[in-house]
Design a protein with these regions (language model features):
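RNase H-like, Mg2+-dependent phosphodiesterase core
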Residues: 1-228
């Protein structure tokens, strides 16, 4: 019988596999992590990813996408794509966000991402909250992208995919700087909205965009920032 090495802890002393380890020990066969990217921006979709990593394989560099520089995210994304047992991706565009609200759009994208996993999981670790649409055992974890390697992997995939979408939107709507600010409410972005107007990629239910449509956009505050 092979000897299993002691799990490697992260810089905070935690075993990044401890949630997954508990579920595999309880008899689950395929444990997925699911997370999203893009809840806060004024433009672009909210993107969700679900990932099933091979049990107990070391992924020491995988961590919350917000803590990873852009160049390293791409490297880790390729590593995840190469080794993951399954990856599911889904997105809800601005028009859906405006119709159902950002919380429900996020839940919808996350549930769809899980549904696209082949083979399907029998347990899901969810960043933040329960997903009512899931027909599988699930465990919501607050700050899960910092506490579960599977959720962290999902956060990286979602972030890389969303950034690629924002680069495509930059080509579709030149001059807005989508490739730079990723749709977040930076002063640069607000100035572009004031100068060029609102595009179909913008979330009209978000207050700064609604203000722009009413001709009342305040350029002073920076609504939200995000890592590059």
């Amino acid at each position: 019988m092979p000897v299993r090495k002691k799990p490697r802890n992260d810089q905070n002393g935690r075993d990044p596999w401890h949630h997954e380890r508990a579920l595999y020990g309880a008899g689950y066969a395929r444990v997925a992590g699911v997370d999203e990217a893009g809840r806060g921006p004024l433009a672009g979709p909210v993107v969700a990813a679900a990932v099933i990593l091979p049990p107990y394989r070391r992924f020491s560099a995988i961590r919350d996408s917000k803590l990873v520089p852009a160049a390293e995210r791409e490297t880790l994304y390729r590593q995840i794509r190469k080794h993951a047992l399954a990856i599911g991706i889904a997105a809800c565009p601005a028009r859906v966000i405006d119709r159902v609200n950002i919380l429900e759009a996020t839940r919808l994208a996350m549930a769809r991402a899980v549904a696209r996993l082949k083979p399907p999981p029998d347990a899901v670790l969810v960043d933040g909250w329960r997903l009512p649409a899931l027909q599988v055992d699930q465990w919501p974890i607050v700050d899960g992208d910092r506490d579960s390697v599977s959720i962290a992997a999902a956060s990286l995939v979602a972030k890389v995919i969303r950034d690629a979408i924002m680069r495509r939107l930059e080509r579709l709507y030149p001059g807005y700087g989508f490739a730079n600010h990723k749709g977040y409410g930076t002063r640069e972005h607000l100035a572009c909205i004031a100068r060029l107007g609102v595009t179909p990629a913008h979330r009209c239910s978000f207050e700064p965009v609604r203000q722009a449509l009413q001709g009342k956009l305040d350029l002073a505050p920076e609504v939200s920032g995000e890592e590059n």
